[in-house]
Amino acid sequence: MARPAKPAEEPQVEALCCELGFRLPPAAVTGLTVYLNMLQKWSAVMNLVGPRTWQPMVRTLIVDSLHLDRFLRDAVPQCGPQIWDFGAGAGLPGIPLRMVWQHGEYHMVDVREKRTMFMQMVLARHPLSGTFVHRARVEDFMADRAPADMLVSRAFMPWPELLSLLEGRIRQGGHVIVLANEPAPDHDRPDAAHGRPLPSGWDLTAQYVYEVEGSARYFWALSSKKAPS
């Protein structure tokens, strides 16, 4: 039987984040250590994430949240208060993001019971202001809510279907933030994965690229040009 993985300790987590180029405040280091240890423990018995130990979790998963913090501060500095995160899964990128970026109300939505239970337990252990977990279909979640100011999507669904789903659900001037493995499309430039140009109701307002273990990853900021009906 394999030995249980050693738990993360705050000095180790802080040092690894510094190695990756991120100097975190003490409260974020504490919260991230709690999260990593819970993620490591739960992933030993269920398929929450691919990595099973905390170091590769930081290098390949948490790093997305830390880069996303930088991107949002630069690309969407005046974001409104209602932020949605669909298909939040194990709380990535949302929970680590909220440890360093506390803007507005951040609503993580997932239909899967065990994943929402995990996120709720993390927030019970380490509360994050303005951060909420919802177990629901996204269609039901959106049904009785005003349009959002921003939506974050990491592998929830292909972006063309996502923008169709969000028709009338993002306020005019609001943003959809897509975490992707390829450059963003534009109105006259289809994307590589789907061969689709950006629809006329959206503008690409910012893009960010970074490298994780030799592969490029991207954030797209897509701004809604239409007022909700």
Curated annotation (Swiss-Prot):
Quote the record's binding site residues for S-adenosyl-L-methionine: 87, 92, 138-139, 154
Q: Please give the InterPro entries that the UniProt record associates with this protein.
A: rRNA_ssu_MeTfrase_G, SAM-dependent_MTases_sf
Report the principal subcellular site.
cytoplasm
Q: Which reaction does it catalyse?
A: guanosine(527) in 16S rRNA + S-adenosyl-L-methionine = N(7)-methylguanosine(527) in 16S rRNA + S-adenosyl-L-homocysteine
Looking at the UniProt record for this protein, which Gene Ontology cellular component terms does it annotate, in alphabetical order?
cytosol
Annotated GO molecular function terms are: rRNA (guanine-N7-)-methyltransferase activity
This protein's name? Ribosomal RNA small subunit methyltransferase G
Supply the Pfam families for this chain.
Answer: GidB
Tell me the name of the encoding gene: rsmG
| UniProt keyword Cell division present | no
Where it sits in the cell: the answer is:
Cytoplasm
**What is the scientific name of the source organism?**
Oleidesulfovibrio alaskensis (strain ATCC BAA-1058 / DSM 17464 / G20)
- EC no. given is 2.1.1.170
Function statement: Specifically methylates the N7 position of guanine in position 527 of 16S rRNA.
The text of the family note is: Belongs to the methyltransferase superfamily. RNA methyltransferase RsmG family.
Keywords, alphabetical: Cytoplasm, Methyltransferase, rRNA processing, S-adenosyl-L-methionine, Transferase
